Amino acid sequence: MWSLHIVLMRCSFRLTKSLATGPWSLILILFSVQYVYGSGKKYIGPCGGRDCSVCHCVPEKGSRGPPGPPGPQGPIGPLGAPGPIGLSGEKGMRGDRGPPGAAGDKGDKGPTGVPGFPGLDGIPGHPGPPGPRGKPGMSGHNGSRGDPGFPGGRGALGPGGPLGHPGEKGEKGNSVFILGAVKGIQGDRGDPGLPGLPGSWGAGGPAGPTGYPGEPGLVGPPGQPGRPGLKGNPGVGVKGQMGDPGEVGQQGSPGPTLLVEPPDFCLYKGEKGIKGIPGMVGLPGPPGRKGESGIGAKGEKGIPGFPGPRGDPGSYGSPGFPGLKGELGLVGDPGLFGLIGPKGDPGNRGHPGPPGVLVTPPLPLKGPPGDPGFPGRYGETGDVGPPGPPGLLGRPGEACAGMIGPPGPQGFPGLPGLPGEAGIPGRPDSAPGKPGKPGSPGLPGAPGLQGLPGSSVIYCSVGNPGPQGIKGKVGPPGGRGPKGEKGNEGLCACEPGPMGPPGPPGLPGRQGSKGDLGLPGWLGTKGDPGPPGAEGPPGLPGKHGASGPPGNKGAKGDMVVSRVKGHKGERGPDGPPGFPGQPGSHGRDGHAGEKGDPGPPGDHEDATPGGKGFPGPLGPPGKAGPVGPPGLGFPGPPGERGHPGVPGHPGVRGPDGLKGQKGDTISCNVTYPGRHGPPGFDGPPGPKGFPGPQGAPGLSGSDGHKGRPGTPGTAEIPGPPGFRGDMGDPGFGGEKGSSPVGPPGPPGSPGVNGQKGIPGDPAFGHLGPPGKRGLSGVPGIKGPRGDPGCPGAEGPAGIPGFLGLKGPKGREGHAGFPGVPGPPGHSCERGAPGIPGQPGLPGYPGSPGAPGGKGQPGDVGPPGPAGMKGLPGLPGRPGAHGPPGLPGIPGPFGDDGLPGPPGPKGPRGLPGFPGFPGERGKPGAEGCPGAKGEPGEKGMSGLPGDRGLRGAKGAIGPPGDEGEMAIISQKGTPGEPGPPGDDGFPGERGDKGTPGMQGRRGEPGRYGPPGFHRGEPGEKGQPGPPGPPGPPGSTGLRGFIGFPGLPGDQGEPGSPGPPGFSGIDGARGPKGNKGDPASHFGPPGPKGEPGSPGCPGHFGASGEQGLPGIQGPRGSPGRPGPPGSSGPPGCPGDHGMPGLRGQPGEMGDPGPRGLQGDPGIPGPPGIKGPSGSPGLNGLHGLKGQKGTKGASGLHDVGPPGPVGIPGLKGERGDPGSPGISPPGPRGKKGPPGPPGSSGPPGPAGATGRAPKDIPDPGPPGDQGPPGPDGPRGAPGPPGLPGSVDLLRGEPGDCGLPGPPGPPGPPGPPGYKGFPGCDGKDGQKGPVGFPGPQGPHGFPGPPGEKGLPGPPGRKGPTGLPGPRGEPGPPADVDDCPRIPGLPGAPGMRGPEGAMGLPGMRGPSGPGCKGEPGLDGRRGVDGVPGSPGPPGRKGDTGEDGYPGGPGPPGPIGDPGPKGFGPGYLGGFLLVLHSQTDQEPTCPLGMPRLWTGYSLLYLEGQEKAHNQDLGLAGSCLPVFSTLPFAYCNIHQVCHYAQRNDRSYWLASAAPLPMMPLSEEAIRPYVSRCAVCEAPAQAVAVHSQDQSIPPCPQTWRSLWIGYSFLMHTGAGDQGGGQALMSPGSCLEDFRAAPFLECQGRQGTCHFFANKYSFWLTTVKADLQFSSAPAPDTLKESQAQRQKISRCQVCVKYS
């Protein structure tokens, strides 16, 4: 038992010990003791288990003993509960750079980068290997056969025919026999015999010269494809233009100077050597200049370097830290008076001052000129200006030899020559003489008859000539001819040939290509020093120099006490000049200097003979006629080599030939040319030259078209000038005239210089003549190259020369006509055979030979030189339409459109908010009638009373009888016009009416008569009338919900209406109740006569309203009463329900023409009309002036000719048929079109149906669409002059250009002008009338750059510019000085006097500006003086009859209105949450607009903007609108990852960060308005809209926006009282983050917005909120609290 007790004690002790560490130890111990001892268990044994053997004395309790020693340490207790989180520590120091992190996820795709700069041109590559032989080309078509040429000239005389047969034997003569007759002496030569009979046709003469090329024939059918032709000769090119100069190379070290003696023999230039080995490294260069200070931010602190070597002992350290604080010193003297403090902050706003005195405003003074705008971009090259006035006469030009001009036109045929002298008579018996000189050519014979048509064989002999073909178009130039034979070998002679006589001066040649570099010349004498060149670019930095020897250790420096930073020193003296820079690149060519004065005559010295020149090219053959253009026949076979011709006259020097192949040098001793001697004196004048030969006759000009016959003139009076005829077709060329070449005439006197020409086209100008050699000038700066001038006008013909010496033998003339048959010759013996005759005329061209066989492939020719630069090609045809381009980036926001037409009636809206409590109502209307009283006694018949009040509306009667069926309803007479009613409230918009019928197409106009002549340009017309309004703009954005209006005052009751129509007599009523008994009963009397009317009784009291009677039977319809008098206007009625659409009415008579109304609201765009018929062809323009002759073409198609003078503008054609392109994007708003004319009257409406039940007329139908505009009325008479006010009116809008004036009378004929140069493009013609709207095309290419717009308004002040470059160092002397203390601030100066008012500036040009912002509400002005009475207006159209309304009683006085004065000065900020600017509420002027800034983050700290305050509406947007500055007076911009956050619009979320213009549609716009009182937001915390307090009105309703966070843990919030906490629209992502440094914006994933939620009132203090995730927009909105912004209005 004891053991159990001990065990229990131990257990309890252990339990108590283990629990004693807790706070409940006492209780547990007591509990445990009770558990042991108090368990109620009895121990069995004596004394209850106690030891009773010993006496138990209970002594008294002793006093408390001393405290025991401390017990041993207890065991460690269990871990305590975690404590609360401590406060955040201070921000730690910047840690070491961490290891590079893992690669992040791929970021969003960045925007496309800016295209790089174009790379430098590469080094030209080596020539490529020759390509493989190309495939044979396609077979060409046979060319069409040319027209037969003109008949050749008459052939030369054929050789004499064979002798004729012997004649018949003559009669025998008489025999005379004389004896002894001696033979007589030979008699005189007999007379020439009679001409013999014509001989037989001689053999064919030699072939005549080639005829002129015929006109091209009609295009024949394409021939069979020919075989492939032989390979052509390699083309001959021209050396290409010199390339751009290369980059300047590094400056080489100077080479050794060698003087080379001239060699004894010809030197040859060797081949280029191989590239040398790299040179040795040069000496170190001089030290470079100090570089410019770098740009960029200071870098991050670098990584600690390795420990350096032990340094020298340092100098004395700086003073130590200040010591401990000393003891309190003695009291000092009172200080001096302080300096005047700076100007204080501006004081609070004062009370409004009294209203100012109204002064008549003076004329507006012009403000000071604004800041200069930024320079605009260079405009495009302007149009060519008009020709300047004629310049002064220039000096006579010097004649220089130029190139041979093109062949002149064929001259007119010469006159027939004089008959030759008679020849010596021939002897019949002599041998035939030598052939005589060819006779002069005879006159041309008459043209032969037209031959028969030829046969159609392709290869055949020449057929008979065909009939005259129609004149063909000018054919293309022929291709390049075959390569000519190789010329004769040139002579090699070391001596130059004798100098030929000088040729006549040629025309100026074109500028030759740049020649090769000449041999190096001798060193010239030292020239005068040139002017200083332009400053070259800085040289490249020098290489690092070799390290110098270590310097000696410097002396120990003085100890510097001051630690104040000194001021910036002054600029030091200029350093020594730097090393010369690298040579600059070539400057551009300078302007040509003016012609210098002639120099003084040079000293004469014998010139050393110059070196031998290269052999000159052979001159062209002398005076042959001009070569005709190439013919169209096939090339003939090469002829045999002819005999060498007679040497011709020395030809004019031809143009420089192409550079030949490298020649073989013939070894001969060549001496280096000596130096040029000084110019010799002028020689004596040479003898007078022989007269020059007369030029060959030119081709004949083409005849013009025959003009139209003029009107027959009268005998004396000259008729009016006739119409100008069209230019005729060119006539056929006449026969070539003959005339011997005349002697050359003397040179003509120099002509007067022509006027200065318009600058010519640089591609076609000629090189001017070389000037006389002037003195060597100082080399000028090379100017830009000028444009070559036009050739001068042709000088007048020279004085005719003296008769020249006998000319050389003329050329062989053309064959003459066959002579008249001569008399028969004497019979004589057959002569000896004659000398062979001259070659015959050339025969007709033979048929083309058969195509030859394919030749052997030719060797690859050497590469030809580059061809000349081609002439500009013709403009290509317009390309096919490309596919539609990608949509462009959104354009900038356009101006506000015109107000759109009212939209159709929308569906019924949600019920509105409960209105504000109304004012106390007026007394109610009369009550219902009381119960029926007892019947009274029957009274006497009263006199008729006054007209009673209008009875209550009777009950609806029974349906009437069926009316008769009207066959044709006649139109009633129109009623008298009622007075116009007051304007009702605007009704709901009716449904859109049916569109009108399509108008008929108009007839095409006829041609007008031709004008007499081109009129002078009319003067500028008066500005036209303003056009009609343009088409409606696109629908504007939805406006703000309007504020609920104030309750209107109760309207006055209307006046009583006119009497109604007489009612139909009712049926007899039922029998009345029985009356009371009478006092006396008399017998009934006979029926009396009707009594006379009694006097009117007194007014009885108004009886109570009777009960409505029982409905009587339907009476017969009454006649219409007379029209009532018009009552006063009634109050506007409530809006009726829209009536059913009525049947269309009959067509009314056309009304009188109304005055021109104000421009209406633009109607909706009409249905696209049908395509117009194609317009008639316009009249032919006047024939342009004849263009100058073009240069010969190099290829098949010549260059485009110069642009002719534009013809007169043709009549305007009708619109063409519509294009087939799909509609393009909507164009910009076009200019208003002219008003349409009235359409034809519509067809008569359908006959109405027969009425069965005549219902009450329905309410009026909806208003139909507006009709077409009527034609413009005639302008009214001029109005009366207006009164002259003190204020000057604003300048009117710029007028439209007036119509062109009528043609003026014909001017006098002008003098013949010199031929002008090619004209430039004409100026832009006047703008035509706007055509009808065409179909939408594809999006066009970007338009030309527009004209510069008007200068914009002055922009806001820009951001501070970057810090300027450091100034030049100041001059300092050697003594450093401690800077002085800053001076005391000066006293504030007195206020300057007001300046004198400036002169009034001139009125600025320009059209009327845009309307300015609304000004603040001004004080009521003094009433103006009454204006002059206007003239009586025209009668208006008949108005609709107004309904008569009864006049109401006078209402109670209204509440006191706002007096004039200012608003309260409170600011209200509206954020649209779209990209459109919000509008201010009614009566609140707008102060500015801008972009909605939510908050900024800089240095990872956020700064919030309250959206209800004006600071959240920044006028200008920037992704980083701030910079940060530090104590070192340095500011940094865009150097850290700072951000800005802006309220966003409703644009769809983008996939990539936005940049530049793409950001604009995503930023919300805002406006700051001036409000009369402070606006307050109220929040409901549920789905209902909270009401505004009494006497407050609503501004807008929205959703409760609470706070936001962005990058990191930074963000901000809105005060719930602020209007910024009530956003009109809920967005889960309501703001946009812009990364300032990158200039991009995006909706990033770590942005959160916080909104007040809805809370049910019964769950305010209940269980924890249930978590929820809302993904649908509607569910999100239902969870967000609603709010309303209110402002006090009374």
Curated annotation (Swiss-Prot):
Tell me where on the tree of life, at the top rank, the source sits.
Answer: Eukaryota
Q: Where is this region: Disordered?
A: 61-173, 187-258, 369-390, 405-451, 469-1457
Function according to Swiss-Prot or TrEMBL: Type IV collagen is the major structural component of glomerular basement membranes (GBM), forming a 'chicken-wire' meshwork together with laminins, proteoglycans and entactin/nidogen.
Leader sequence residues:
1-38
Q: Give the sugar-modified residues.
A: 142, 669
Where exactly are the transmembrane stretches of this chain?
none
Q: Does the keyword Cytoplasm apply?
A: no
Pfam families (UniProt xref): C4, Collagen
**Protein name, please?**
Collagen alpha-4(IV) chain
From start to end residue, where is composition biased (Gly residues)?
149-164, 199-208, 849-858
Q: Please name the taxonomic classification of the source.
A: Eukaryota, Metazoa, Chordata, Craniata, Vertebrata
Find motif (Cell attachment site) and give its ranges: 94-96, 145-147, 189-191, 310-312, 724-726, 785-787, 989-991, 1212-1214
What subcellular compartments does it reside in? Secreted, Extracellular space, Extracellular matrix, Basement membrane
Residues the record annotates as the site (Cleavage) are 1206-1207
List S-S links within the chain: 1480-1569, 1513-1566, 1525-1531, 1588-1686, 1622-1683, 1634-1641
**Region: Triple-helical region, residue numbers:** 65-1459
GO biological process terms, semicolon-separated: glomerular basement membrane development
This protein's UniProt keywords: Alport syndrome, Basement membrane, Collagen, Deafness, Disease variant, Disulfide bond, Extracellular matrix, Glycoprotein, Hydroxylation, Repeat, Secreted, Signal
Family from the record: Belongs to the type IV collagen family.
For this UniProt entry, the molecular function terms from Gene Ontology, in alphabetical order, are:
extracellular matrix structural constituent; extracellular matrix structural constituent conferring tensile strength; molecular adaptor activity
Q: In which tissues is it expressed?
A: Expressed in Bruch's membrane, outer plexiform layer, inner nuclear layer, inner plexiform layer, ganglion cell layer, inner limiting membrane and around the blood vessels of the retina (at protein level). Alpha 3 and alpha 4 type IV collagens are colocalized and present in kidney, eye, basement membranes of lens capsule, cochlea, lung, skeletal muscle, aorta, synaptic fibers, fetal kidney and fetal lung.
Name the Gene3D superfamilies on file: Collagen IV, non-collagenous
The keyword Repeat is annotated on this UniProt entry = yes
InterPro entries recorded for this chain? Collagen, Collagen_IV_NC, Collagen_IV_NC_sf, Collagen_superfamily, CTDL_fold
